[in-house]
Design a protein with these regions (language model features):
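Conserved beta-strand-loop-alpha-helix hinge in the C-terminal portion
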Residues: 227-251
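ABC ATPase NBD coupling module
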Residues: 70-84, 89-92, 114-117, 121, ...
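H-loop/switch region of ABC-family ATPase nucleotide-binding domains
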Residues: 207-208
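The feature captures the beta-strand-to-loop junction immediately N-terminal to the Walker
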Residues: 39-41
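Conserved ABC transporter NBD signature motif
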Residues: 62-70, 230
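Helix-to-loop junction immediately C-terminal to a conserved catalytic motif
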Residues: 54
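A short, flexible loop at the N-terminus of ABC-type nucleotide-binding domains that lies
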Residues: 2, 11-25, 75
Length: 260
């Protein structure tokens, strides 16, 4: 098992009148090579789960194992050696004031004791161009352009490439197409699928786009109020349709008095 969340308890505003229990003995497991699409309504626990995995947040109880090793107390920075993350906001994964080349060199030097200039040589520059060619956006010809001048789609594509530059073992995609226009969103998913397939990297993708959840990945998980209410893979995942997911969402809504 690559990732194993065991008996997680997560409470917000603990000990106050606003105390809210999200996870109460939550279990979640991911095998190596899985591409898991995670869906669910707002407040279902999707992003909190990602934050716990990456180390951006901590649970009150439970364990997080990565390849059998307990990483529950491991700081976020150290987890970044083997976990890459792309956020919803295209601005979050790159530095606007630096060029494309400088952003990639900075990522290339992550966890190393070298200056920025160490990575900027002809060999590395050619390597960066080759990585950017996969985006099919012409970014390989704009290495000296400031990232702040790129479109949202271009910047998110760069963030995805950067997240995959080092030897990460788990890729976290946190609604990484949500802030993009429809065309850029489709381009981003094409690039995402291509990069994941090429590397065979284990991936968790949180999305509100049900079609993307159905069309991409080999496993689909639906969350609701801190619980997994649907978990399918294999032939079930291949046969899944958007309408099936909508029906489950509606059943949940009816149970909570919000059905139509």
């Amino acid at each position: 098992m690559m990732l194993d969340l065991q008996k997680i308890v997560k409470i917000f505003n603990e000990g106050t009148v606003d105390e809210a229990v999200l996870f109460d003995g939550f279990d979640f497991h991911v095998k190596q090579g899985e591409f898991v699409s995670v869906i669910g309504s707002n407040g279902s626990g999707k992003t909190t789960m990602l934050n716990l995995i990456c180390g951006a947040d901590a649970a009150q109880e439970g364990k997080i194992l990565f390849r059998g090793q307990d990483i529950t107390m491991l700081p976020e920075l150290k987890r970044a050696k083997f976990i890459g993350r792309v956020f919803q906001d295209p601005k979050a994964g790159t530095c606007a004031g630096l060029t494309i080349l400088e952003n990639m060199a900075l990522a290339d030097n992550k966890q190393k004791h070298f200056g920025l200039g160490f990575a900027i040589n002809k060999k590395r520059t050619d390597h960066y161009r080759a990585l950017l060619e996969q985006c099919e956006m012409g970014l390989e010809n704009r290495l000296n352009v400031k990232v702040g001048s790129l479109s949202g789609g271009q910047r998110q594509a760069l963030a995805l490439v950067i997240a995959n530059m080092t030897d990460i073992e788990l890729l976290i995609l946190d609604e990484h197409t949500a802030a993009l226009d429809p065309k850029s969103s489709e381009t981003m998913m094409y690039l995402t699928d291509k990069l994941i397939s090429q590397r065979g990297i284990t991936t968790l993708m949180v999305t509100h786009n049900l079609r993307h959840a159905v069309e991409y990945g080999n496993r689909l998980v639906m969350m609701h109020e801190g619980n997994i209410v649907k978990d399918i893979c294999g032939e079930q995942k291949r046969q899944a349709k958007v309408q099936d997911l909508l029906e489950v969402f509606n059943e949940i809504s009816i149970e909570n008095g919000n059905g139509v």
